[in-house]
Amino acid sequence: ACVLKGSSEAEQSNRAAIRIIQQVLKKNGLPAAVVTLLPSERETVQELFTATQYVDVLIPRGSDGLIRYVRQNSLVPVIETGAGVCHVYVEKKADINKAVNITVNAKVSRPSVCNAMDALLVDQSIAAAFLKKLQPALGQYQVEIFADAAAYKILKGYPHLRRATLADFGREFLDLKCAVKVVKDSAEAVDHIRKYSTRHSEAIVTEDKKQAEYFLHEVDAAAVYHNASTRFTDGEEFGLGAEIGISTQKLHARGPFALEKLVTEKWVIRGNGQVR
């Protein structure tokens, strides 16, 4: 059975969705009650946290604060659909046009989702050429940039430029905003990602296969990309069907997951008197 608990803001929409689901279940000879909507009051969540006899797993979907609250208070196992502080690293041997297209897509195609880019890292040897070409592309969408000292110097004159603080590099903006940092090399980029990443989706743009493999091997994330946008981290895109969430933990599921990850195994052994 599946028990759903939605927010009060979407209560009418949730009820409508449940009605449709239950109608389909009945039409196919299944009991409608296998999918149930709980009242939106907060007290019902507290009861779920301790219902270890009846509930196998909780999957919180929502803000980082909500997910953290569920994880810290639940006695029932939790699959975290964590926040995404996602990075794109433009390495010194990147194709600049390709890097601009990937960066713009990762940031602006849908900025309010967890697989959107939040921080851009650029190799110092390509920073000036790349950022000057990226500037009008992001400016077209009025993207607000929080730049470190080196990037700020290059981007000076960009109308939506701000000086970055350390906190900006760990922010999930969920908006047309991003942090930009110039790094010395791939090692510094990887170290930065290790410090600030939520282990969701991380990308490198480069034509150097050795540097790409180094990045893909060293970065610990549910999805790592070479020359592609972080926006592909999605159940439908990965061929999994309807997505339940994107997990940033390593157990029980990691990355985009669908119904298959919510089933387990049962061993059935038929014998004829065998003993051990």
Regions found by a protein language model. Give the residues of each.
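Short, small-residue-enriched loops and turns at beta-alpha junctions
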Residues: 9-14, 153-154, 233
